[in-house]
């Protein structure tokens, strides 16, 4: 009798549900996955090596391009590692601004995740709603840094500039009449903080909308409940972090367990799952959006009451003000030196980790006393999660592989880096 062989199937890298350039080699028995072999490296851009050839400040924009859905949180880990080596303290106002933008970025990431995950499973409406909300948050990025995605807003010693007093407004054009224009600019009359405050006042209702569409939806539950189950012990052994670990019932969040910046002064909860399946991870991330809303609200309240510097007053690290640079020779020299040679970081090594929307994002930095890193190692959460795909998908149907890739929330910028 002829030997029955497993069927081998290539999934991606052009597949719409592959979230970028994932190539999976699936070994199938009928429609059941026996083995899932991820092939990575199709988006490798040598970020770690490039950083060794650039000054410390020139590598900040590279960080935006790692996980290109959670831009500012990547920068945060990098500048924190530099600050550890320099031994400098960031002004409190800058810390609050950083925390606020970390949470804005978390919401941006989770909106992209819920939209793409729902679209993969077959619910298109959520995708459209999520992108409606993302648009406002992209405008917040643009107002503060000039770029909708790659902000390069965090700097060693603080942030690039203070929050603007006016929110940019839509201008008149041929495609909008006066009535539509005034409606679009309705919540843009005040400062950037007013705009963010208005958005996060409306946002909980938007999250309720997504939950109405998905949480008790029969098809959604059939596709997610009991799929990709990971036990708490196994999740720890596999190096899972973030929502992947919390979905398995382990309460681990760097913002609470190893607080950085001003997270220890803020009031928020850590959502934790019970069953460790795709559905629990979905519920954890949805609740994270609500908790981020709470954190942003507290930051706005503090920032309104406490004006102050947003950059350290140390011209060896931070550039002088634009006005000072144009009117004072000494400050011009400092400015020129900072942006040509850069600052020298004392010899040593440091590891800084932040609670990234996808898990623990870490930067391990070694300095030999020069103006460039000797070695930069990036600990990407998605890399560890993707390596668990084989174990999570084994014994499931092909259609469930799409759900499992979606629940891992993978972006290949950081996996391949």
UniProtKB/Swiss-Prot annotation:
HAMAP family: NDH1_NuoD. Its EC number is 7.1.1.-. Its main location: membrane. This is NADH-quinone oxidoreductase subunit D. It is found in: Cell inner membrane. NDH-1 shuttles electrons from NADH, via FMN and iron-sulfur (Fe-S) centers, to quinones in the respiratory chain. The immediate electron acceptor for the enzyme in this species is believed to be ubiquinone. Couples the redox reaction to proton translocation (for every two electrons transferred, four hydrogen ions are translocated across the cytoplasmic membrane), and thus conserves the redox energy in a proton gradient. GO terms for cellular component: plasma membrane. The keyword Cell division does not apply.
